Regions:
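Formylglycine-dependent sulfatase
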Residues: 1-245
Length: 245
């Protein structure tokens, strides 16, 4: 749809302008025109960088791409503690409460919208686009989530990757003959690193793992809310894995 690369890397040449033509019918718009309530929550990386200011144009913002409701951030990433949030087209300040985290906030917003929609228009189906900022950088997660993985990666990445592929083979996640890809030359052998590097890199791995588990937890809250409103058996989940884990 005229976007040959991510929006920030568009060139202006045909097929790579970073601008979805208005002649293209977005999925959400097709569903909305056929009676769906539509909401987008979290990350929206579908708008060219020069169209993301409060001055617009807003043609490629979620609410002009078929979504009745949008709560989230525009672009590839945001601070999870102090995010740059938009409610539809309006810049809003994150709630001022202790322990605030955007993934929790966007999940609360998604659940609230879904329950309100079902309360007001129970006869209408809904389509929700739920895209967390995780686990894209910045890797911001409450300490208690990261601390759950204390010591899990102390053996270092050379050993951990071997243990991981062995576990995946035994669980049937990958074929038994699957071999590890060669390690990139730029990644040093774990045993050649200093003690400070060991501490830094193991903590980074703990934070990443905690960030991922926290995200799983929030997705679980959303799924539980769908079950609470009695729509689990009539809901289709489409999971799309991104490029950041």
């Amino acid at each position: 749809a005229n976007t040959g690369s991510i929006m920030e890397s568009s060139t202006g040449f045909p097929g790579n302008t970073g601008q979805v033509p208005n002649s293209v019918a977005p999925l959400a718009e097709m569903l909305r025109l056929n009676g769906y309530c539509t909401g987008a929550f979290g990350k929206w990386h579908e708008t060219a960088a020069w169209e993301t200011s409060v001055s617009g144009p807003f043609d490629r913002w979620p609410t002009r791409q078929g979504f009745d409701k949008f709560y989230g951030f525009i672009g590839g990433e945001t601070d999870q503690w102090v995010p740059l949030i938009y409610d539809n087209l309006t810049r809003v300040t994150p709630p001022e409460k202790e322990g605030y985290h955007f993934t929790v906030d966007m999940t609360d917003q998604a659940i609230g919208w879904m329950k309100a929609q079902q309360s007001m228009t129970p006869d209408k189906p809904f389509f929700m686009y739920y895209a967390t900022g995780a686990v894209h950088a910045p890797h911001h997660v409450p300490r208690e989530w990261a601390d759950k993985y204390k010591g899990k990666f102390d053996a270092g990445w050379d050993k951990v990757r071997e243990e991981t592929i062995a576990r995946q083979r035994s669980m049937g996640v990958v074929p038994t003959e699957t071999a590890l890809a060669p390690k990139p030359e730029d990644i040093k052998d774990w045993d050649s690193l200093s003690g400070d590097e060991h501490r830094l890199f193991t903590r980074q791995a703990e934070v990443f793992a905690g960030f991922l588990e926290q995200t799983d937890h929030e997705v679980g809250r959303l799924v539980a809310a769908i079950e609470d409103i009695g729509e689990m058996d009539d809901t289709l989940f489409i999971y799309i894995a991104g490029d950041n884990g």
